[in-house]
Regions:
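Redox cofactor-anchoring modules in respiratory/redox and cofactor-processing assemblies
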Residues: 1-98, 103-113, 118-128
């Protein structure tokens, strides 16, 4: 048996499972096992500004820009680009000819922007 990748969820929105002893919980849509070439990520190359990710985004967002801002840790700019509206469907990453892990960067950015929003709310609450 070759290398396989096990996902909690489907091939586009699923998250890789590092521990196969993890329980399957109610919110899990399924377990996906990828083998062969499907288990490997393509080699990332530079964005060619083709905008396929933009066309594929059901929320009308600009995934290439959000990934770029996330890489550069520009959280305020990322918040202004409505990163929290991303539904993490994976369509952008699936269509990217440059094999950029857009969804990984967007998820990281959403976490950081969420922390920024919570910190801002906490600071505002302490002022009252």
């Amino acid at each position: 048996a070759g290398d396989v990748k096990v996902l909690n969820g489907g091939p586009m929105m699923g998250r890789a499972m590092s521990n196969l002893a993890s329980p399957v919980v109610k919110g899990c849509s399924g377990i996906t096992v990828l083998g062969g070439a499907a288990a490997l990520r393509g080699r990332e190359s530079s964005c060619i500004k083709c905008a396929k990710c933009v066309s594929a985004c059901p929320m009308g967002l600009e995934p290439y820009l959000m990934a770029k801002l996330s890489r550069r840790k520009l959280w305020e700019r990322l918040e202004a680009e409505w990163v929290t509206n991303c539904i993490e469907c994976g369509c952008c990453q699936f269509t990217c000819p440059a094999d950029i892990p857009l969804l990984d960067f967007i998820r990281m950015g959403k976490q950081e922007v969420g922390a920024l929003i919570r910190a801002r709310a906490a600071a505002h609450a302490t002022k009252k």
